């Protein structure tokens, strides 16, 4: 279980599906263990769609030191997870193997993303916190006016 503890004390708990996307799951968990996400923000928020975080630059252009293979149908991988409310998936650039550290949590269903992004788990607790994040005021490029900070991200056994 992955726990995202927000700076306001709110908690989001995520169950990872290693069978659906093993490379993605391992990469995400390794970044969590390294403390990579601690202090980073949800830098892109689109209500009725998703909240996106995991960029050390905080502007959508950053990532970790490595990219991983995209585990989704358009890249030749059978990933059964659909992009429904509460699902966590990897953000990427146009290159199907460009996912790194940026992820997004679905605020609403988005079937057009199925087969295009590596979904790898779902929120099991804290969708109310996701709803609160989705409701914050945003400005240019859907960036929150006030930073939405992940204080700590860790694995709960």
Region locations from a protein language model:
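Cyclophilin-like peptidyl-prolyl cis-trans isomerases
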Residues: 1-157
């Amino acid at each position: 279980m992955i726990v995202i503890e927000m700076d306001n004390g709110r908690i989001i708990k995520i169950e990872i599906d290693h069978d659906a996307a093993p490379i993605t799951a391992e990469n995400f968990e390794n970044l969590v263990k390294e403390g990579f996400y601690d202090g980073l923000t949800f830098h892109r928020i689109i209500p009725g769609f998703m909240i996106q975080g995991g960029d050390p630059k905080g502007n959508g252009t950053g990532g970790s030191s490595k990219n991983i293979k995209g585990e989704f149908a358009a890249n030749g991988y059978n990933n059964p997870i659909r992009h429904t409310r509460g699902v966590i998936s990897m953000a990427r650039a146009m290159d199907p193997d460009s996912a790194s550290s940026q992820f997004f949590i679905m605020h609403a269903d988005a079937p057009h993303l199925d087969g295009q992004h590596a979904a790898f788990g779902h929120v099991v607790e804290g969708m109310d916190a996701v709803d609160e994040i989705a409701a914050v005021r945003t400005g240019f490029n859907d960036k929150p006016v006030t930073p939405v900070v992940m204080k700590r991200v860790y694995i709960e056994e």
